[in-house]
């Protein structure tokens, strides 16, 4: 099963999802880090650390972090002691914030931040040992094309880790998530980011995205091996892993 409908931040008929996603993140880039940590109560940092630990067995020297945003996943991956991390995103605004963060913390010697399209990666086959995506694949315009590109640029037996929001199924997390998504995220997102559509898009995009076994089946059909998933915080987020 794939996405049944295309959910875009602004819903403009004359613009692609990719264009609207880039515009949205440019609009909220200055407040993104604060809002991300505030709205998740800082739990997103714990989720990234858990995802990074799943790459320890690979001992990656080259890591690609797609939809890198301001680079939080790339920074978390420094724990693996790689020689090179490439963070790629389509939003210049997010990348600028990320570059400033890397320079300020002295990470710019290992982590490079590049503008690029996750569905048309400018890398040769089998280049990276590992690949990460944090809260980004649901923003792909063509999900399967993006997932195929991810597999292409990772070496044989390399590992791909995808961290993405999902929809809790059990009480009371299901009810908490529904309230948080419908009222808390749009309320604070609008007032702090000044972009009303951006944080209304978040729960809408999560609702439209295939998750759990549906997403695993897509990965397996595209050639990912040993696909597995792990629920976080009662199903608010999920870590998916696969091997090339």
Mark where each language-model region is:
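A short glycine-rich, Lys/Arg-flanked "PGG" loop and its adjoining helix->strand segment in the class I
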Residues: 144-156
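N-terminal auxiliary segments of SAM/dcSAM-dependent transferases
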Residues: 1-22
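Class I SAM-dependent methyltransferase SAM/SAH-binding core
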Residues: 62-120
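Core SAM-dependent methyltransferase catalytic element
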Residues: 216, 222-244
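A short acidic, Gly/Pro-enriched loop at the edge of an enzyme's catalytic core
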Residues: 119-130
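Conserved alpha-helix/loop element of class I SAM-dependent methyltransferases that forms part
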Residues: 31-34, 41-61, 76
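C-terminal alpha-helical "lid/dimerization" subdomain adjacent to the S-adenosyl-L-methionine
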Residues: 19-20, 90, 163-218, 222, ...
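Hydrophobic beta-strand segment of the Class I
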Residues: 32, 131-132
């Amino acid at each position: 099963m794939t996405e049944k409908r295309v959910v875009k931040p602004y819903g403009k008929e004359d613009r692609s999802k990719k264009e609207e996603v880039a515009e949205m993140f440019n609009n909220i880039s200055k407040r993104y880090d604060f809002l991300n940590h505030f709205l998740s109560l800082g739990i997103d940092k714990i989720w990234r650390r858990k995802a990074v630990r799943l790459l320890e067995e690979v001992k990656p020297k080259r890591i690609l972090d797609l939809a890198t945003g301001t680079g939080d996943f790339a920074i978390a991956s420094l724990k693996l002691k790689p020689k090179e991390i490439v963070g790629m995103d389509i939003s210049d605004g997010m990348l600028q914030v990320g570059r400033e963060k890397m320079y300020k913390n002295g990470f710019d010697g290992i982590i490079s931040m590049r503008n690029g399209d996750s569905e048309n990666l400018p890398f040769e086959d089998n280049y990276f040992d590992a690949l990460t995506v944090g809260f980004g694949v649901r923003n792909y315009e063509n999900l399967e094309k993006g997932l195929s590109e991810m597999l292409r640029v990772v070496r044989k037996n390399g590992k791909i880790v995808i961290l993405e929001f999902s929809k809790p199924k059990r009480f009371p997390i299901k009810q908490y998530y529904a309230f948080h998504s419908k009222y808390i995220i749009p309320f604070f997102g609008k007032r702090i980011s000044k972009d009303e559509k951006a944080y209304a898009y978040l729960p809408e995009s999560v609702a439209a995205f295939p998750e759990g076994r549906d997403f695993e089946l897509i990965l397996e059909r595209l050639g990912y091996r040993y696909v597995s998933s792990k629920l976080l915080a009662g199903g608010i987020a999920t870590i998916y892993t696969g091997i090339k």
